[in-house]
Amino acid sequence: MSGGDWSHSGRGAALSPQGGEIGARGEVGVVLGGVRRRVCLTLGALAEIETGLAVEGLAAAAERMKALSARDLIVVLAAVLRGGGETAPDVAGVEPREAARAVAAAFEAAAR
């Protein structure tokens, strides 16, 4: 999902035009490169992160994420964007600070 009307997600949850939590399942609206997008830490996203970071289990993933490389950040951002509904997210051009904020927002929403 990129751009478009963010007044409704199609899943019964209101979407925030400024970013922030937008759904009961932990979705978060973020702005990446001036485009509103949705991130969500799903079970599938966690599995993708484990695979992409070549770690086994959540504890190992959490430890690895304490010091992410740029490649690692791309893996994690793409996973949470797919969790938010995107099928082929293009993340290579996203600024690192925006990427880190989006990833943090997805994890924070999942922890609530």
Can you name each region flagged by the protein language model?
Residues 30:
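Short aromatic-centered micro-motifs
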Residues 1-25, 43-112:
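Short, surface-exposed, charged amphipathic helix/loop patches that serve as local interaction elements
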